[in-house]
């Protein structure tokens, strides 16, 4: 019994020691939690510093990659190292978050729970121990009393001995029960103490796992640093990659000269200089002024010479006295240095203009600046551009009327000393032969020039492939001058074209400024682009209304008269600025065409085509030996007046000029054959418009081959006289009243 009591005392002491240890561990846990919180704060700061460090590290790696001295291998290795460090930084961020979320916060909560659990365990143990001790003490007291009583009874009968033995056994059992109770209390205390550390390990595991992952990324740095050590082992020796930089530089056009922006246009140069002077240094070095077979020193329309040369003399580039273009806003064209119509980067023979009022007829007047301003007519050439060959006389009455309204002469060489016009250059057979390698009759050149010069029109939905049409600038005034725009003109609103330049019989016209003759025109090459879509040449002055219907001309107008409805603008006469909105979708003026009648059959009247039509020359080499020549001389779409072909009309019969009859008689023989072949070609005229006219089935695919054939023998036929008179008479334009100021409109 005493031994059991000692055992119970020992167990009770052990339990109490365990409980005391648990209670004394709380400050340690709390200190650990505090230090972990500080570590988390420092790790967050480290993460932010690592991010900034790695950003700077990446810049160094990029610099190493792009620098010529450091090879790409070094830059690539540094980039890989930076990537690994960024991965380490990511894992460090994860470790920091796990430290707070998985360890610090849960441990702080568990410390409070541990305190409560230890206190409760101590209370329970004390209660059980007191109860067991009380029972043992009571039973022991009863046993002592029974022993005393048994001693007295020993002298007597001895009846109390069994009771005493039973009481002693009960006391022993109580001590054993107390011992067992103490053991259970100690076990609970040990489990509680152990559970705390188990919980701590559970909280610590995610933190350590994140740290291991972070440290696992560090192992990849070993290979990267080994590569960098090898790449940078010999800093004083260039590797092959650096030697390749020197090899690559050899043969390349590497220059340190900085390109300056184009200079602003000056008063003595074209307005196009602001957009055309950038590559002009190369054009000036490529010989833009080489003489041409025609005999005139001209400027090529090719890509090498299509920009204004910087080396042009300042004395010959005086600004035109009138810079007003009737339809384009302004002229921006020098009299002697004129930009070719189309800046397409093609060869010299295929560089053509497709302006709405300009054609490819004159082969000798190649570099004439054709502006719509009164002082720069198409027949006025510069001093260094005098053409060779005969000249085509212009209508003198128009010249005289034009001189009355013109200001002083423009740049040097444009006008004579007396202010009179230089004679108009004729496209001579020699010049054509020089261009095409064959001989062409004067009649062919005259007829082709007139048809292409005066009646060449373009479709409304055409898209020009030249720069000046979309930029607001105009290389040469390629729109008809018969429209009064915001910029005033010193001429009438009408124009008429003729073959021989004879005077009109129905009132003297006041000017003739819309016959644009381009420079360097190889007519045969432009024939290939007949069916290509082209853009209108001007941004203003073109009709916006639909094409006239098949009802024909107004009843009050003669059959060969096209009415243009224009009224003077009420806007102030200010120069139009460059518009950034792009070209206005407008339609060029249309001239009516009548199907021709072959002169060999005088009684034949071809089908009349009222309204506006265009004819495209096509070649029938078996039936017309001159057709290839005619197609070369006039490859563009030609519009003919509806009275130019067929039976003579009263206007055509009574219209010959005073000085043109003799010349007409001389050229009738040669022209008749041309007219006959031309009639066959015009018979298949290409209808113009957006489905407003039926397309004739007689027009087959436009041939692309242009086989030169010798001109036919001259023949003479009287019916050709009236037709040529009608051709020479041209189209008569009349004034009508309208509120439309955008473009001439053919009714």
From Swiss-Prot:
Polar residues composition bias: residue spans: 368-378, 480-492
Classification via SUPFAM superfamilies: BAR/IMD domain-like (SSF103657)
Residues of the WH2 domain: 719-736
Pfam families the UniProt entry points to: IMD, WH2
Biased amino acid composition, Low complexity: 256-284, 321-332, 349-367, 466-479, 646-659, 696-707
Keyword Methyltransferase: no
IMD domain segment(s): 1-252
Start-end of Basic and acidic residues biased regions: 397-406
Effect of residue 152 to D: Marked reduction in RAC1-binding, loss of increase in RAC1 activity and of dorsal ruffles formation in response to PDGF treatment
UniProt feature coiled coil, ranges: 135-159
Record key words, sorted: Actin-binding, Cell projection, Coiled coil, Cytoplasm, Disease variant, Intellectual disability, Phosphoprotein
GO biological processes: activation of GTPase activity; cell projection assembly; cellular response to platelet-derived growth factor stimulus; lamellipodium organization; membrane organization; plasma membrane organization
MF annotations from Gene Ontology: actin binding; actin monomer binding; GTPase activator activity; phosphatidylinositol-4,5-bisphosphate binding; phospholipid binding; small GTPase binding
Region feature Disordered, mapped onto this chain: 256-302, 318-441, 457-522, 543-599, 638-664, 691-720
Phenotype for residue 123 to D: Marked reduction in RAC1-binding, loss of increase in RAC1 activity and of dorsal ruffles formation in response to PDGF treatment
GO CC annotation: actin cytoskeleton; cortical actin cytoskeleton; cytoplasmic side of plasma membrane; lamellipodium; ruffle membrane
Effect of residue 116 to D: Marked reduction in RAC1-binding, loss of increase in RAC1 activity and of dorsal ruffles formation in response to PDGF treatment
Modified residues (Phosphoserine): 264, 441, 579, 601, 612, 624, 634, 639
Effect recorded for residue 115 to D: Marked reduction in RAC1-binding, loss of increase in RAC1 activity and of dorsal ruffles formation in response to PDGF treatment
Subunit structure, interactors included: Interacts (via IMD domain) with RAC1; this interaction may be important to potentiate PDGF-induced RAC1 activation.
Family, similarity comment: Belongs to the MTSS family.
Disease entry from the Swiss-Prot or TrEMBL record: Intellectual developmental disorder with ocular anomalies and distinctive facial features: An autosomal dominant disorder characterized by global developmental delay, mild intellectual disability, ophthalmologic anomalies, microcephaly or relative microcephaly, hearing loss, and characteristic facial features including long, upslanting palpebral fissures, bitemporal narrowing of the forehead, arched eyebrows, and epicanthal folds.
Function: Involved in plasma membrane dynamics. Potentiated PDGF-mediated formation of membrane ruffles and lamellipodia in fibroblasts, acting via RAC1 activation. May function in actin bundling.
Name of the featured protein: Protein MTSS 2
Natural source organism: Homo sapiens (Human)
């Amino acid at each position: 019994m005493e031994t059991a009591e000692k055992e119970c005392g020992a167990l009770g002491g052990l339990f109490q020691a365990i409980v005391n240890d648990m209670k004394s561990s709380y400050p340690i846990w709390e200190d650990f939690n505090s230090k972990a919180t500080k570590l988390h704060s420092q790790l967050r700061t480290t993460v932010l510093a690592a991010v900034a460090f790695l950003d700077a590290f990446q810049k160094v790696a990029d610099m190493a990659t792009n620098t010529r001295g450091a090879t790409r291998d070094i830059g690539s290795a540094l980039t890989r190292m930076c990537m690994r460090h960024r991965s380490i930084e990511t894992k460090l961020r994860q470790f920091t978050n796990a430290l707070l979320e998985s360890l610090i916060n849960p441990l702080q909560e568990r410390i409070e729970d541990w305190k409560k659990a230890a206190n409760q365990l101590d209370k329970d143990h004390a209660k059980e121990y007191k109860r067991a001790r009380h029972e043992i003490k009571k039973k022991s007291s009863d046993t002592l009393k029974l022993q005393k009583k048994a001693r007295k009874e020993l002298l007597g009968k001895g009846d109390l001995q069994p009771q005493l033995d039973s009481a002693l056994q009960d006391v022993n059992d109580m001590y054993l029960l107390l011992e067992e109770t103490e053991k259970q209390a100690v076990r609970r205390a040990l489990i509680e103490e152990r559970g705390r550390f188990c919980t701590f390990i559970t909280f610590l595991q995610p933190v350590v796992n994140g740290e291991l992952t972070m440290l696992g990324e560090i192992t990849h740095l070993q290979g990267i640093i080994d590569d960098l050590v090898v790449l940078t082992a010999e800093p004083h020796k260039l590797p092959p990659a650096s030697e390749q930089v020197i090899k690559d530089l050899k043969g390349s056009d590497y220059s340190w000269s900085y390109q300056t922006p184009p200079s602003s246009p000056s008063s003595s140069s074209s307005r196009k200089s602001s957009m055309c002077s950038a590559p002009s240094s190369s054009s000036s070095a490529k010989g833009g002024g080489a003489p041409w077979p025609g005999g005139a020193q001209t400027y090529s329309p090719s890509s090498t010479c299509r920009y204004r040369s910087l080396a042009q003399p300042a004395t010959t580039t005086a600004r035109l006295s009138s810079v007003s273009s009737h339809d384009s806003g302004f002229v921006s064209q020098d009299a002697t240095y004129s930009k070719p119509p189309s800046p397409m980067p093609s060869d010299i023979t295929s560089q053509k203009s497709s302006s709405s009022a300009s054609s490819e007829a004159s082969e000798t007047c190649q570099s004439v600046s054709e502006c719509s301003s009164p002082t720069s007519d198409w027949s006025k050439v510069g001093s260094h551009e005098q053409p060779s060959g005969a000249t085509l006389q212009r209508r003198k009455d128009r010249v005289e009327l034009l001189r009355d309204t013109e200001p002083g002469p423009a740049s040097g060489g444009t006008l004579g000393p007396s202010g009179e016009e230089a004679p108009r250059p004729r496209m001579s057979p020699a010049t054509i032969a020089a261009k095409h390698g064959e001989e062409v009759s004067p009649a062919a050149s005259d007829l082709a020039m007139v048809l292409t010069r005066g009646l060449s029109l373009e479709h409304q939905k055409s898209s020009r492939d030249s720069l000046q049409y979309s930029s607001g600038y105009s290389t040469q005034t390629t729109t008809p001058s018969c429209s009064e725009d915001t910029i005033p003109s010193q001429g009438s609103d009408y124009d008429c074209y003729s073959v021989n330049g004879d005077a009109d019989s129905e009132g003297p016209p006041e000017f003739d400024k819309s016959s644009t003759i381009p420079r360097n025109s190889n007519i045969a090459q432009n024939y290939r682009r007949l069916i290509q879509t082209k853009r209108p040449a001007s941004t203003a002055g073109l009709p916006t209304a639909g094409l006239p219907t098949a009802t024909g001309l107004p009843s009050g107008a003669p059959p060969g008269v096209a009415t243009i409805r224009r009224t003077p603008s009420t806007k102030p006469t200010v120069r139009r600025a460059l518009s950034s909105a792009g070209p206005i979708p407008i339609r060029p003026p249309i001239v009516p065409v009548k199907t021709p009648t072959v002169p060999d059959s005088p009684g034949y009247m071809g089908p009349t085509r009222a309204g506006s039509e265009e004819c495209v020359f096509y070649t029938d080499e078996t039936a017309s030996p001159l057709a290839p020549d005619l197609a070369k001389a006039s490859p563009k779409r030609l519009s003919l007046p509806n009275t130019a072909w067929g039976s003579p009309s009263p206007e055509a019969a009574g219209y010959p000029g005073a000085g043109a009859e003799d010349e007409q008689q001389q050229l009738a023989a040669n022209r008749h054959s041309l007219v006959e072949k031309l009639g066959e070609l015009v018979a298949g005229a290409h209808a113009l418009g957006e489905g407003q006219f039926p397309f004739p089935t007689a027009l087959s695919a436009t041939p692309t081959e242009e086989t030169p054939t010798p001109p036919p023998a001259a023949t003479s036929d009287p019916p050709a006289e009236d037709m040529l008179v009608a051709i020479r008479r041209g189209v008569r334009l009349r004034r009508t009243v309208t509120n439309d100021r955008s473009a001439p409109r053919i009714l």
